[in-house]
From Swiss-Prot:
Role, per record: Involved in unsaturated fatty acids biosynthesis. Catalyzes the dehydration of short chain beta-hydroxyacyl-ACPs and long chain saturated and unsaturated beta-hydroxyacyl-ACPs.
Keyword Lyase part of the UniProt annotation: yes
Protein name: 3-hydroxyacyl-[acyl-carrier-protein] dehydratase FabZ
Example GO biological process: fatty acid biosynthetic process
Active-site residues, Swiss-Prot/TrEMBL: H47
Pfam families documented for this protein: FabA
Family: Belongs to the thioester dehydratase family. FabZ subfamily.
Location of this chain's protein in the cell: Cytoplasm
Catalytic activity: a (3R)-hydroxyacyl-[ACP] = a (2E)-enoyl-[ACP] + H2O
Keyword annotations of the record: Cytoplasm, Lipid A biosynthesis, Lipid biosynthesis, Lipid metabolism, Lyase
GO MF annotation: an example: (3R)-hydroxyacyl-[acyl-carrier-protein] dehydratase activity
NCBIfam families: fabZ, PRK00006.1
Gene from which the chain derives: fabZ
Length: 146
């Protein structure tokens, strides 16, 4: 899945679109995506000026976007103005190594279960085959409140 298809499913745009490409997709089961981390990311200006590190919360956000793509593409639900994909919970988040400019962040999301419209995933971010972060994420699609 290239960036053009990703934009059909995710409502995120610069500077918060954190998935560049989908490398593998197994409907209802798993998705592997890629984020190229460059020194031009706006967050590196302040985090940290002399030793740039991608904020952990943005690594988790990138994982949540990969999980969203897994659910939305599985369900064939494109981004629209009537519904929104919410990140509703996180368990067991761990950060194992920093993510720095020049890294390729591999984002892996695997469905653990789906119940009453809430999806639970095992999510892992890797750089060069080493775990950078991992967590269990919970998300849901809901109508937008007007």
């Amino acid at each position: 899945m290239d960036i053009h298809e990703i934009l059909k499913y995710l409502p995120h745009r610069y500077p918060l679109l954190l998935v560049d490409r989908v490398l593998a997709f197994e409907p209802g089961k798993s998705l592997t995506a890629l984020k190229n981390v460059t020194i031009n990311e706006p967050f590196f200006t302040g985090h940290f000026p002399h030793h740039p590190v991608m904020p952990g919360v943005l690594v988790i956000e990138a994982l949540a976007q990969a999980a969203a793509l897994l659910t939305l593409k599985t369900s064939n639900v494109e981004a629209d103005e009537n519904s929104i994909y919410y990140f509703v919970g996180i368990d067991n988040a761990r950060f194992k190594r920093p993510v720095e400019p020049g890294d390729q962040l591999i984002l892996k999301a695997t469905v653990l279960k789906e119940r009453i419209g809430i999806w639970k995933y095992a999510a892992r971010a890797e750089v060069d085959g080493r775990v950078a972060a991992e967590a269990e994420l919970m998300c849901t699609v809901r109508p937008k409140e007007t």
